[in-house]
Amino acid sequence: MAALCEAFTLCGLGPAGGVGLGSGLLALEPGADPDHVLLTDRGRTTTLFKVSDQKPLGCWSVKHGQIITCPVVCNFETHEYIAVHDNKVLRIWKDEDVNLDKVFKATLSAEVYRIHSLPHAEPLVLFKGGGVRTLDVLLEAPQQEIENVISDEVIKWSEAFLESRQPVLIFVTEKDGDFFVYVQKPKMRSLHKYKLEQQELCNPLSFTAYIKKQIITLLCLYSSDSVYKVLIPLQQSSEEEEQTSSKSLLLNLSISGSVLKGTSFVVLDKDHVAVLGSLAASGEESKECLTIWNTKFQTLQASKELPLGTSGQLWCYGEKFFFTHGKVLTVVIYKCETSSLAAAVGKLKDSQTSDLSSFVNWNTLGDEELLVSLQSQQSVALKSESKMTLRSKKSAVANIQPDTSTVGQFLLSIKDASTAAVEDQLRQLLSKAQMPDFQATIGCIISALINRCKTDPKFYPRNFLVQMIQKGELSYSLCPDLMAVALEKKDVHLLQICLQRFPDIPEEITYACLKVFLSISDDYLERTDVNLESVISYIDIEPNNKEVKTEVVENGFNTELEEDGCDVTGMKETHMMDSVEFCPVGPQKAALLNAVLHSAYSETFLLPHLKDLPAQQAVLFLRYLHYLYVKCSEKINTTLPGILSPTISQIMDWMCLLLDAHFTVMVMLPEAKGLLSSMHRFVRAQVRLYSELNKIEGSLQELQRIKCQKHSQAYSIEVLELI
């Protein structure tokens, strides 16, 4: 038996990764770790993802004007990544590499169709002319001549396997409506060609294959809504140039009058295949869906509708399906069990439900589905208890049941209730002493509230949302639409708390928060509830008070001094000028910007978004960062007072990011030139300061070393005067 289990979103897709054939991704390949996948888009970027965390680990792009023409793969032996751009240019790099322009490059003599990576073997490079080379042989002479095996044929599909520790490559070509299968063993220099038996009025759409006992089983998905099987033996005694291979019907994709128009499929085991396509019944509109079929019993065993549409691509790694759904890449966990008549009728002995980690995407469920999901999770939790439950534990479990029904009633009642009524019910609900799986329950409730907020603009239980975030029970992945709604309503206080509490906010959302904070006027923010704990201890709130002095210890040089001069009086005067330099933004906006500085990010993913920041906002943000840097430098320990105040490392990192994104624009802006010049002088003075401190430290260490030297063959008489 087979079943589709939990589904979750791995990542969003760009404009080219949408719905429809010809769109989507270039490919999805496994990474060095079983939990890693390599995503290559139809442009110039590839991204490494950790599936269980739903977070990117690295992203690499070729230059503008170049395009990746071959899916990026991982060399399982060296843990290096291999890509081909512009058909002939080979690139090889490692995790720590950032700029692909600086990694290994080789220009080949022929165009590459695909690179296949195999465990415990060198990757195989398949050229568009049908020639094959192992990567090590190819790198010895990148410009070596590649033979043209196929004439006027176009490769449609390819796959590589290891059989008896020998690599085997199989690829399918097409010419004038005829399809051919090539089986090649690169190390044995053997190549066999087969012609697929033609099928009237239909053509193969997709291929997949596997090897077992020296026999290749090639499965072909035809436009006649059928899957055919072709058996090709690896051991061939015949030396014929071309042989015709017969096929046999494996599966008809029809059930109860409905026909599945498949676009792609994968083999799960010897009895199961998964097919992605459109299920159409007579007189009804077709629906795209993911299905699992049992080839042994010719039955449909699992199906999942995909209302947002797909690109027709399907991948399967580690008991997980990967496919595009709308504008996101979706992951669906599945399970397959041994096919038998006993299992089909539920009479298989010792059958147990496998333990699967729960991945619930609360955002995609409606209120009724949320309730069913919540109840199913709680029932699983209760069933997992030992069968030898004590009476006391049974009574405790019994006490939990009313809470479940209470949560369910609440989810069904919030559709029409007012904000005040909903918040009152929530306070009563959360006051319960016991609540099973508290975090999942809260995630379910938050998602239901957000769904109501989307449909009813007047409904917004802000107080409850703030309370739940402050308790630390939520994360961005648990309620991904929460911050989107807060951004739409410009609820800066809620966004501030999310930035401080959520550890997994995507860089796109962090940038959106920064842009909103910079665009809102200080006058508006003065009427807004914002937590000022991160700024109240150091910011200059009274701009008219010119006598404000901060408790600092001077550690900076006069920025106006010459390189070889040092005037203490000038230093003090300059320091007095710096100490009364006022913050370029109000305290409320400063507190919000501090929350952005505290959020976790990856420079690779944040920098493209920062480049879209308007120039005036970028200058204002840079002025504030400069102000913070000056304030930090005034302190002997270079730390700002207050709770959740930004560190000097965070300030410097953001300054570098902002300058990387906008340096050319800022150099051209008149209002930014003075700021850049001031920053340059200040940083130069700091560098000179630390240079002098390093010299002093070196001198002290040398004095300490001389003082500690012992002369074993000498003696001295010391006279000590006691006072």
From Swiss-Prot:
Primary subcellular site in the record, as a coarse category: nucleus
Gene Ontology CC: nucleolus
Function, in words: Ribosome biogenesis factor. May be required for both optimal rDNA transcription and pre-rRNA processing.
InterPro entries: NOL11, Nol11_C, NOL11_N
Cell location: Nucleus, Nucleolus
Disulphide connectivity of cysteines: none
Highest taxon above the source species: Eukaryota
BP terms from Gene Ontology: maturation of SSU-rRNA; positive regulation of transcription of nucleolar large rRNA by RNA polymerase I
Full protein name: Nucleolar protein 11
UniProt keyword terms in alphabetical order: Activator, Nucleus, Ribosome biogenesis, rRNA processing, Transcription, Transcription regulation
Presence of the UniProt keyword rRNA processing in the record: yes
Zinc recorded as keyword: no
Pfam families reported for this sequence: Nol11_C, NOL11_N
